[in-house]
């Protein structure tokens, strides 16, 4: 029969590109699990009372090319003015060698958070370099491997200051009045839930206030003034006040390190080290503190350790501080941070080196001096005598200046009384400065830049002598070697090949949804129309962004069954926090602010209790029954016990045990009965889309991990996006923003992120995914994710018991393999299996979560049958190896499992093991072998001998 034009157009072509198994393979797998069709399998697994009759209507699928053309037209509505707004965001020049070989390279952006250090040494080294940059520039002892943005880093600094403060009865936090307004906004939001009083005043008056546990100063104020806070910090320290300083990476190249002035904590944004503004993000924040406070620091910290052979190796250090272990007692709720962006900043520093960075910083400052000199020569007054890159210029006719700026397609900062702000950056040229003269002076001015340059070069006093840096920075060889593009390209490749990412193998991490990040989805993030917009530009310049965000929000509303979506939270953990704040403020609006009990199942992800604590709630744990489901009797008892103060429940669906709980609606009803709200964690949304939805189930609010379900890549540990969907009654209580008031924003509540739409520049990834999949494709993706998980479970269940199943012995989109019986019988642990999988070319599944002694496997819909079979074959081969240990063929203390992973150097070393070299390194054959570069790490050594800065090059050789 002749095909129709519609069939030939094949608008759903991307669906087959995204979903791994083709129709024939799907049928083979369905036969293996005993189901007739995807719909039949879904019908068996998902409780009937929550199944949607039809998929949410988000439109038909579009081809990659059609979707890209459509989004390009939308992006074209954005106006790319030259922005001198500043406020922590500047234009940058991302070196093309980093753009092509890292940002656009799936070997970097598809990797996962480096919990498995043996397959993560490349990005761990890049992150260690980032920490070294932070240490050198801040003058402190300990640095983290990035936080979400500068404003949330400020909030973390406040929380940390309280943790380490010796003034236990003090409950006030002082903020200098010239911090960035978005920073103050987020600090106030966080302080409210912690019960802190925030004092905002001129820094000179910090000593006038009593009962202050911490002070936040900004080295270069929001309107540009450089402050020498040495004396103030000394006096504050004498009073045992914890001092935090917000700083700027580029300014710190020239300015005195705040740590040398006595600051306890220094933080800021690393955005201007090569990361585009992107209408607000994603960007990495840096965070450093004194050594004595290291165990109270938030976020990931990369440390130097040893592997089993005694070689230098890197790992995430001191994880016992973090949410996945300490839960509500964690220092922070951070899970995803900003690894990809931190690594861009790290490599930017490596590529330019100290000499290049000083040249860039000095050029920015020179152009600022030239601009200042010319304006003053023509009679304009500067509000501050000391500055680095930002001028606050007093103008008589501000409206006329702003009109001339708009006509010249220039954005100036306009929210300063009787003045405008101008921040220059590394993209600024002498031609730009000449144009700024025209805008500010109103026509012909007769100023000569060459003449002005000679004048300021001889007599620049805009940086106080006391504030000039007097020590060397970035002296480590890594920052002084890779300055040609050839060397830089090879260095980045050498790092990349140490790691295991999705471009090499499946990453079957349960609860992480490591699905395809398609090239067509990634292309728009580097379009200048999206990448170059300042987050505080006039709304009419961002109409393309607003259209894209509005469409994406509308699709997410339909897919979740909620009434509204807020895009501000820039990670899943931030989404949890924002959702819980919405619940808190809702109760307060009903004069029920006393409701502060958050029920959390024992199986919950560690971010849940950590977020509840941050939102000012008390955690009450609800038991799970022997099948892994929420114990309804225990839930009822605790809901009734705390009825007067019940705020909410946080529940994940499908559960973290990998099953669709039959009683989920009853759970919602019980909580609602006693006055609580239902927070449904969106971590497992990949098993809901098109099949059911949180709103349909009965939940009130959820966050969505766009970096899981909706294809934003994990980036080796960030970026992420965690927008929240809410029912109508919670919509007035989602985060707002103090700087930008955009029509259509839902609320005027405080902010949780620095930018109004969080990490806006990665939202096109999720837009593209939904647009190319369409309603039917999205449902099919969920169904194949379920099929793939059940196929693995059915083929492995005889070798490794599946811990929890639902009806008919089925699982949802992931399954938990119970290793405990094997360990008891043979001594081989889940850790041994995880490390042995590296020899077979796989990243390990999730270890010991949510149950100790288990492996949780989530294959996603993107993996084809061949890759699933390869993984299954590896797991079965490992089981056969365990049997060899059990039979005594290999001793427990010397076998391929306990010695895994094996590295190349072992092949040429003396071999004393009872198994062959071939068994060690080629258990799955020699084709496309992944070689780890270190053996199993010594975690105890790493934490007992904490070292978090760059090691000598010889240690890597």
UniProtKB/Swiss-Prot annotation:
It catalyses: N(6)-[(R)-lipoyl]-L-lysyl-[glycine-cleavage complex H protein] + glycine + H(+) = N(6)-[(R)-S(8)-aminomethyldihydrolipoyl]-L-lysyl-[glycine-cleavage complex H protein] + CO2. Keywords: Oxidoreductase, Pyridoxal phosphate. One of its GO terms (biological process) is glycine decarboxylation via glycine cleavage system. CDD domains: GDC-P. Its cofactor is pyridoxal 5'-phosphate. It comes from the Bacteria. One of its GO terms (molecular function) is glycine binding. Its EC number is 1.4.4.2. The modification N6-(pyridoxal phosphate)lysine is found at residue 708. GO terms for cellular component: cytosol; glycine cleavage complex. HAMAP family: GcvP. The glycine cleavage system is composed of four proteins: P, T, L and H. NCBIfam families: gcvP, PRK04366.1. Belongs to the GcvP family. The glycine cleavage system catalyzes the degradation of glycine. The P protein binds the alpha-amino group of glycine through its pyridoxal phosphate cofactor; CO(2) is released and the remaining methylamine moiety is then transferred to the lipoamide cofactor of the H protein. This is Glycine dehydrogenase (decarboxylating).
């Amino acid at each position: 029969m002749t095909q129709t034009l519609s069939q030939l157009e094949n608008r759903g072509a991307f669906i087959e590109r995204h979903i791994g198994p083709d129709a024939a393979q799907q049928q083979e797998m369905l036969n293996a699990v005993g189901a007739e069709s995807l719909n039949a399998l879904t019908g068996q697994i998902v409780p009937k009372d929550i199944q949607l009759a039809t998929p949410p209507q988000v439109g038909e699928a579009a081809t990659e090319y059609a979707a890209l053309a459509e989004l390009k037209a939308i992006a074209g509505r954005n106006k790319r003015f030259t922005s001198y707004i500043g406020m922590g965001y500047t234009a940058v020049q991302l070196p093309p060698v980093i753009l092509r070989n890292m940002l656009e390279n799936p070997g970097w952006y598809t990797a996962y958070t480096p919990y498995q250090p043996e397959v993560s040494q490349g990005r761990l080294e890049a992150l260690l370099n980032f920490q070294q940059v932070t240490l050198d520039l801040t003058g402190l002892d300990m640095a983290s491997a990035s936080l979400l943005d500068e404003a949330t880093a400020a909030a973390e600094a406040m929380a940390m200051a309280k943790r380490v403060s010796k003034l236990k009865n003090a409950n006030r936090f002082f903020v200098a009045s010239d911090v960035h307004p978005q920073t103050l906004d987020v600090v106030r939001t966080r302080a409210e839930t912690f019960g802190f009083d925030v004092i905002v005043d001129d820094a000179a008056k910090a000593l006038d206030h009593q009962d202050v546990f911490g002070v936040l100063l900004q080295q270069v104020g929001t309107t540009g003034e450089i402050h020498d806070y040495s004396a103030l910090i000394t006096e504050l320290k004498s009073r045992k006040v914890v001092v935090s300083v917000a700083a700027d990476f580029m300014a710190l190249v020239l300015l005195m390190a705040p740590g040398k002035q006595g600051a306890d904590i220094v933080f800021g944004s690393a955005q201007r080290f090569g990361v585009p503004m992107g209408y607000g993000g994603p960007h990495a924040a840096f965070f450093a503190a004194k050594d004595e406070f290291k165990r109270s620091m938030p976020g990931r910290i990369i440390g130097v350790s040893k592997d089993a052979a005694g070689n230098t190796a890197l790992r995430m250090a001191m994880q016992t501080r973090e949410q996945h272990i300490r839960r509500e007692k964690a220092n922070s709720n951070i899970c995803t941070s900003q690894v990809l962006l931190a690594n861009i900043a790290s490599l930017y520093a490596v590529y330019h080196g100290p000499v290049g960075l000083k040249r860039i910083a000095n050029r920015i400052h020179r152009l600022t001096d030239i601009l200042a000199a010319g304006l003053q020569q023509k009679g304009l007054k500067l509000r501050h005598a000391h500055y680095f890159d930002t001028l606050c210029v007093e103008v008589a006719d501000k409206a006329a200046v702003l009109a001339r700026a708009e006509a010249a397609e220039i954005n100036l900062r306009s929210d300063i009384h009787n003045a405008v702000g101008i921040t220059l950056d590394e993209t600024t040229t002498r031609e730009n400065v000449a144009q700024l003269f025209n805008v500010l002076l109103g026509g012909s001015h007769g100023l000569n830049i060459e003449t002005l340059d000679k004048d300021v070069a001889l007599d620049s006093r805009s940086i106080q002598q006391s504030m000039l840096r007097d020590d060397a920075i970035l002296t480590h060889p890594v920052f002084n070697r890779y300055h040609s593009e050839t060397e830089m390209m090879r260095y980045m490749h050498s790092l990349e090949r140490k790691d295991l990412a999705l471009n090499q193998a499946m990453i079957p991490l349960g609860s992480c949804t490591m699905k395809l990040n398609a090239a067509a989805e990634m292309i728009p993030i580097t379009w200048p129309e999206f990448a170059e917009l300042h987050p505080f530009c006039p709304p009419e310049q961002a109409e393309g962004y607003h259209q894209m965000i509005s469409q994406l929000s509308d699709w997410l509303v339909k897919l979740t069954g909620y009434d509204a979506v807020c895009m501000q939270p820039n990670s899943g953990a931030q989404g949890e926090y924002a959702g819980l704040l919405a619940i808190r403020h809702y109760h307060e609006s009903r004069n029920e602010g006393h409701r502060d009990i958050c029920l959390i199942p024992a199986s919950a992800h560690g971010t849940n209790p950590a977020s509840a604590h941050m939102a000012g709630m008390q955690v009450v744990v609800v038991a799970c029954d022997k099948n892994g489901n929420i114990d309804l009797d225990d839930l009822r008892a605790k809901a009734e016990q705390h009825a007067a103060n019940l705020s909410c429940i946080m529940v994940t669906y499908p559960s973290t045990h990998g099953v669709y709980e039959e009683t989920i609606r009853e759970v919602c009803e019980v909580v609602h009965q006693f006055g609580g709200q239902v927070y449904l964690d969106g971590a497992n949304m990949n098993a809901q889309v098109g099949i059911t939805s949180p709103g349909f189930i009965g939940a009130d609010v959820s966050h969505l991990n766009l970096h899981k379900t909706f294809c934003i890549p994990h980036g080796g540990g960030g970026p992420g996006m965690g927008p929240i969907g809410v029912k109508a009654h919670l919509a007035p209580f989602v985060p707002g923003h103090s700087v930008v008031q955009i029509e259509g924003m839902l609320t005027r509540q405080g902010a949780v992120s620095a930018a109004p739409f969080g990490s806006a520049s990665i939202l096109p990834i999720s837009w593209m995914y939904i647009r190319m999949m369409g309603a039917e494709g999205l449902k099919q993706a969920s169904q194949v994710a379920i099929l793939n998980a059940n196929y693995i479970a059915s083929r492995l269940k005889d070798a490794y018991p599946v811990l929890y199943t639902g009806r008919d012995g089925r699982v949802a989109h992931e399954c938990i393999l119970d290793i405990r019986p094997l360990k008891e019988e043979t001594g081989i642990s889940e850790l041994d299996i995880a490390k042995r999988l590296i020899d077979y070319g796989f990243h390990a599944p999730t270890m010991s979560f949510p149950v100790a002694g288990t492996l949780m496997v989530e294959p996603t819909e993107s993996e084809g049958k061949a890759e699933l079979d390869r993984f299954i074959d590896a797991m079965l081969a490992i089981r056969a190896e365990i049997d060899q240990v059990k039979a005594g063929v290999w001793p427990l203390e010397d076998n391929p499992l306990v010695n895994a992973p094996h590295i190349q150097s072992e092949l040429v070393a003396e071999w004393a093991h009872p198994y062959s070299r071939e068994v060690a390194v080629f258990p799955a054959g020699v084709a496309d072998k992944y070689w780890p570069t270190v053996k199993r790490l010594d975690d105890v050594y790493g934490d007992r001998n904490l070292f978090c800065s760059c090691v000598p090059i010889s240690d890597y050789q």
